[in-house]
Amino acid sequence: MRSSKYLLSTLKETPSDAEIVSHQLMLRAGMIRKVAAGLYTWTPTGLRVLRKVENVVREEMEAINALEILMPMVQPADLWQESGRWDDYGPELLRIKDRNQRDFLLGPTHEEIISQLVRKEVSSYKQLPLTLFQIQTKFRDEIRPRFGVMRAREFLMKDAYSFHLTDESLQKTYDDMYKAYCRIFERLGLDYRPVIADTGSIGGSHSHEFHVLASSGEDAIAFSDSSDYAANVEMAEALAPAGERPAPNQKVEKHEVQGDELAAVLQPLSVESQQATKSFIVKAADDIDSEYVQLVLRADHELNTVKAEKLAQVAAPLEILTETEKATGVEAPYIGVVNAKLPLLVDSSAAHLADFACGANENGQWLTGVNWKRDTGDFSVVDIRNVVAGDPSPCGQGKVKIARGIEVGHIFQLGKKYSDAMKVGVLSESGKHETLTMGCYGIGVSRIVAAAIEQNNDERGICWPEALAPFQVVIVPMNMHKSARVQEAAEKLYTDLKAQGIDVLFDDRKERPGVMFTDMELIGIPHQVVVGERNLDENQVEYQSRKGGEKQKINLDDCISFIQQQL
């Protein structure tokens, strides 16, 4: 490709509304242009990268015998009404009407459409197992689209769905898909972690997320420093402290305190936050003989709402009471565990405390020297906190480390949630009608592009992994339009590289060398070859890798083989 025939629209300045590095660099490198909030046009440079992601994803899906299809982005409401999600889905679902006033929607996901297809086309166990995938545009009407294509309203996604008669068959496909995802991210040159995850609104049982590690990531990942264990923080088990709870040494004392913040309350008591408790009042499950229950944690720990919502005693969705006087008679900072009016669900770390401080269940009062059982009623020990760095790893090996991650893939074992609702089944070998069990496997194709930039950039621009770069090589001729010799050498090099199947950009613009170098470094082409008069005097060209290293003089006759070795 010649720059003179190419849409190369770089920016010198960073747009003011671009918050994270990938958004800034995608705009400056001319990869995307904003159309409206969360909506972007992909330019030729951006689309070249996007297509490279697509190609790797497609190859790995086909390698595990997944069959590609294409489903409509616009979906009829009646299918979503059949599954129950028309009413359950929130405002992220963009609902529209056609000219006949029939309800439709822009698809955020395609479980209903794929279920309808399989329901109509698959009737026998002999057609199973079956895995279908597509690479298709999705739309979710985010309340606050931000970070460019990282959290856009319209995005490109690969979604695959598998159908099985048995859980064992589903598990095999799930394992194959897990390995395929690992190969995809390895081929794309990304530093990633597969993590145990919550199934969320999609539903189902087993689930893994795939995260690209980056400081700008929205998700916290807990992983072991001594094993392959990794989990989303919301799913990582917080192990109970080892050993017996210490014996009581103090008597209970009451103190008058002031302030609404925990730190202000604890300071005059000379109590550290890890030696105090805090409480949350939440709505109880219907079968509990109380309208509310009290969740108790160590004061230095964070409540894990996903874990809390899964407790049998807690109503789902989790409802944390803000006006606590209604349930306890006191304001939130003064809720404690002595003479508690509600059932107590105590995190295991808090349950290991002795001689601790807590609210006195009287406004303006706190207690010190409190001990479980001696001073409290019955309680249940649960795991309801987020793990923190330094905790024992849930796998039993090493300590927990915490990193930020960008979710770029998610796989689920859906079970029969959708196939039951949509009546998707086949005749088994015995002639009996059997409901199918499903798997669901998503990759954020457009999000991968942004995540890769978050992981691969410097002060000059993007430093693409080889597999993702819009071009593999750029030829930068010095003053080509004034030197026939430079033009001839650059043209021949361009022709020879193309003949070898190398993806090359020939920067033949009438621009100053400084502008050309700045643009190419910003775009992030991995290999740069400079053709100039001085080096041609010695039958040489100059080579430099975008990721650094010394400039090298390469014999012009050896240039093609040298570039091939670098690739």
Curated annotation (Swiss-Prot):
Consists of three domains: the N-terminal catalytic domain, the editing domain and the C-terminal anticodon-binding domain. Catalyzes the attachment of proline to tRNA(Pro) in a two-step reaction: proline is first activated by ATP to form Pro-AMP and then transferred to the acceptor end of tRNA(Pro). As ProRS can inadvertently accommodate and process non-cognate amino acids such as alanine and cysteine, to avoid such errors it has two additional distinct editing activities against alanine. One activity is designated as 'pretransfer' editing and involves the tRNA(Pro)-independent hydrolysis of activated Ala-AMP. The keyword Methyltransferase does not apply. It is an enzyme of class 6 (ligase). It comes from Idiomarina loihiensis (strain ATCC BAA-735 / DSM 15497 / L2-TR). This is Proline--tRNA ligase. Homodimer. Keywords: Aminoacyl-tRNA synthetase, ATP-binding, Cytoplasm, Ligase, Nucleotide-binding, Protein biosynthesis. InterPro entries: aa-tRNA-synt_IIb, aa-tRNA-synth_II, aa-tRNA-synth_II/BPL/LPL, Anticodon-bd, Anticodon-bd_dom_sf, Pro-tRNA-ligase_IIa, Pro-tRNA-synth_IIa_bac-type, Pro-tRNA-Synthase_IIa_type1. The gene is proS. HAMAP family: Pro_tRNA_synth_type1.
